[in-house]
From Swiss-Prot:
PROSITE patterns: KH_TYPE_1, S1. Involved in mRNA degradation. Catalyzes the phosphorolysis of single-stranded polyribonucleotides processively in the 3'- to 5'-direction. It is found in: Cytoplasm. One of its GO terms (biological process) is mRNA catabolic process. Belongs to the polyribonucleotide nucleotidyltransferase family. It catalyses: RNA(n+1) + phosphate = RNA(n) + a ribonucleoside 5'-diphosphate. Its main location: cytoplasm. Transmembrane segments: none annotated. It comes from Cupriavidus necator (strain ATCC 17699 / DSM 428 / KCTC 22496 / NCIMB 10442 / H16 / Stanier 337) (Ralstonia eutropha). PANTHER family: POLYRIBONUCLEOTIDE NUCLEOTIDYLTRANSFERASE, POLYRIBONUCLEOTIDE NUCLEOTIDYLTRANSFERASE 1, MITOCHONDRIAL. This is Polyribonucleotide nucleotidyltransferase.
């Protein structure tokens, strides 16, 4: 009899067979599920603390998605040969899993929960993020931890008017859409997507299609729980302290209503601090001993009630706008004189300074991904220092949020970038958030597009982004355009839409409640389009098209092609030739395996010289041509003459002049410049040269050395070549 109570569920999901099992591996974890999708295998585990930490005032959920290099049959690089800090993909996937799980934990549950997903086997054609999300959901479901799941997920592609369920990497390469949707049986909770300027209807259809198709995975998790799930925790939220709620409401409600009439964020924030201090003082005076966490939760509920009530009643929003108005926009380009391109995009109290830098092929980011190494020619880095919100805090390496926001902005801009053969530069955008009050990632999209245009990148169209919010109470709802930070915090849905005049390029949606219908999403997307077009109009007014000239400080590039067999001649022994070339001409030279050479420099003369020298190095000697050569070495029977870089030939003593030559030193010396004709090249590459043939053809003459230096030949014949 086996020591394991192993439960296995298998189902067909589109073109893939999915296998889920629990009960054999990681049995001491709260829940553990192994998910296998066509040889991509993930182990998802969850552990929760039995009690919350004292004074805990938020839900401490941690999700760690970890790719093991052995999953792809690799050994890690570096000195230690171990997996190191999380890659960008691991960080983004951790966030992708966290977002749909977090809203499903019950209110008041403050126990530490850690979800860890290991990728232990990888089929390069099957991305591991969807199996990881399903595995995390299943592990939570079988653990018995308080969780209102399970969650399902699906990836949706779009090609030739048809939706694709969980497309392979090869299919994604030609798809117009890469959309991940996650949700429960009843509702969509999360959407993350990149699209090639698709319409709102196509995007909404993809969300609905994905939600329908994920139900088979949700049903399989239910079956797994029925057969192998652990008992549910005996947990209930703490009973509400009604006397405390009444006291806090009595003191705080009128003051909070005053605070939310203040339109300036700084003034409102200061007023809210005063309200909190007044509440604490009133409770102390009344002799009420209250937990700070409990009071904070009551205050949050009161703030949400005020803000949401105002919007649903048709009253002005926190900053005085109606539900459809975008905040005032100011745009300035070429902000930084030495940068290749820059733009300052300000929308209300959110501001992004975005800077574009152009580089060469050698500046591309080399990413050693689990599925294989690849190069990325477009980078977008998002930074939000604490001063952007008027706070002090840590400054250093980017946090998960910054990596996620940068990735969203990058997704939005990728579809409008020129192809590599149209614009060979490597591009780096950096978005410095200098002020933040909501929607800083979408400000990065707008500022990023303008910075690219300022740098002279021929983007296909302007791209703008807008953050939308939603407030839902029963059958009443309101969609908010261009939300503030407080509206994001107090609302039920935060979704960001970026795109051009023609369609959507990126969509990110996070829904905190169940009950958001297709119709509500349809209204929200239509209103988002209205806001996006308004912002696009402002951007087009500020900068109608990309600059036709690059910045004087940006490198120029020329591209040339050589035969791949000649690459080693250009590189030279130990890189000596190319190192000398780059140093002497002040250029950067990149050579591809197919023989494509890119020469970059801020000096056009330097580029021209580098190109001329490479052409000389790779030139083929042609029989019948006359060359300007240099005598390298004298022999008894002739001389070795260099006619091209790396191309030496024999000038036989009989080919110097028509008369008999007794001693070659009477006619030639080492270092002497001579005009010679290539008269023969054999299959081994040996060259035979003739000085007398060149003299005859060009009408020149030569005298013995003791009678003076060689006479200058006549003008070269047409078609001859001179180094």
């Amino acid at each position: 009899m086996s020591m394991f109570n192993k439960i296995v569920k298998e189902f067909q999901w589109g073109q893939h067979t999915v296998r889920m099992e629990t009960g054999e591996i990681a049995r001491q974890a709260g829940g553990a599920v192994l998910v296998d999708v066509e040889d991509t295998v993930v182990l998802a585990t969850v552990v929760a603390a039995k009690n919350p930490k004292p004074g805990q005032d938020f839900f401490p959920l941690t999700v760690d998605y970890i790719e093991k290099t052995y999953a792809a049959g690799k050994i890690p690089g570096g000195f230690f040969k171990r997996e190191g800090r999380p890659s960008e993909n691991e960080t983004l996937t951790s966030r992708l899993i966290d977002r749909p799980l977090r809203p499903l934990f019950p209110e008041g549950f403050y126990n530490d929960v850690q979800v860890v997903i290991h990728v232990v086997s990888l089929n390069p054609e099957v991305p591991a993020d969807i199996p990881a999300l399903i595995g995390a959901s299943a592990a939570l479901a079988v653990s018995g931890i308080p969780f209102n799941g399970p969650v399902g997920a699906a990836r949706v592609g779009y090609k030739d008017g048809q939706y694709l369920l969980n497309p392979t990497r090869s299919q994604l390469a030609t798809s117009d859409l890469d959309l991940v949707v996650a949700g429960t049986e009843r509702a969509v909770l999360m959407v993350e997507s990149e699209a090639n300027q698709l319409s709102e209807d196509v995007m909404l259809g993809a969300v609905v299609y994905g939600h329908e198709q994920m139900q088979i995975a949700i049903n399989a998790i239910h079956e797994l729980v029925r057969e192998g799930g652990k008992p549910e925790w005996d947990w209930a939220p703490a009973a509400k302290n009604e006397p405390l709620i009444a006291k806090v409401t009595e003191v705080a409600l009128p003051l909070l209503q005053e605070a939310y009439q203040l339109r300036q964020k700084s003034a409102r924030s200061q007023k809210l601090k005063e309200v909190n201090a007044n509440v604490a003082a009133a409770l102390a005076a009344a002799g009420v001993e209250a937990d700070k966490v409990e009071v904070g939760n009551i205050m949050f509920d009161l703030e949400a009630k005020i803000v949401r009530g105002q919007v649903l009643a048709g009253e002005p929003r926190i900053d005085g706008r109606d539900t459809r108005t975008v905040r005032p926009i100011e745009i300035r380009s070429s902000v930084l004189p030495r940068a290749h391109g820059s733009a300052l995009f300000t929308r209300g109290e959110t501001q992004a300074l975005v800077v574009a830098t152009l580089g060469t092929k050698s500046d591309e980011q080399i990413i050693d991904a689990l599925a294989g190494e690849y190069r990325d020619r477009f980078m977008l880095h998002y930074n939000m220092p604490p001063f952007a919100t008027g706070e002090t805090g840590r400054v250093g390496s980017p946090k998960r949020r910054e990596i996620g926001h940068g990735r969203l902005a990058k997704r939005a801009l990728i579809p409008v970038l020129p192809k590599d053969d149209e614009f060979a530069y490597t591009i780096r955008l950096v978005s410095e958030i200098t002020e933040s009050n909501g929607s800083s990632s979408m400000a990065s999209v707008c500022g990023g597009c303008l910075a690219l245009m300022d740098a002279g990148v021929p983007v296909k169209a302007h791209v703008a982004g807008v953050a939308m919010g939603l407030i839902l109470e029963g059958n009443k709802f309101a969609v908010l355009t261009d939300i503030l930070g407080d509206e994001d915090h107090l609302g039920d849905m935060d979704f960001k839409v970026a795109g051009t005049d023609n369609g959507i390029t990126a969509l990110q949606m996070d829904i905190k409640v169940q009950g958001i219908t297709k119709e509500i999403m349809q209204v929200a997307l239509a209103q988002a389009r209205e806001g996006r077009l308004h912002i696009l109009h402002k951007m087009q007014e500020a900068m109608g098209h990309a600059r036709t000239e690059l910045s004087a400080h940006a490198p120029r590039m020329i591209t040339m092609k050589i035969h791949p067999d000649k690459i080693r001649e250009v590189i030279g022994k130990g890189g000596s030739t190319i190192q000398a070339l780059t140093k002497e001409t002040g250029t950067t030279i990149d050579i591809q395996e197919d023989g494509t050479i890119t020469i970059a420099s801020t000096s056009t003369d330097g580029m021209a010289e580098a190109k001329r020298r490479i052409e000389g190095i790779t030139a083929e000697a042609e029989v019948g041509k006359i060359y300007a050569g240099t005598v390298l070495k004298l022999l008894d029977f002739g001389a070795i003459v260099n006619i091209l870089p790396g191309k030496d030939g024999l000038l036989h003593i009989s080919e110097i002049v028509n008369e008999r030559v007794k001693d070659i030193k009477d006619w030639l010396k080492e270092g002497q410049q001579v005009r010679v004709k290539l008269i023969q090249a054999d299959e081994k590459g040996r060259l035979r040269l003739s000085l007398k043939a060149a003299l005859t053809e060009e009408g020149g003459s030569i005298s013995p050395i003791n009678a003076g230096e060689a006479a200058a030949p006549a003008a070269p014949a047409e078609g001859s070549e001179q180094q």
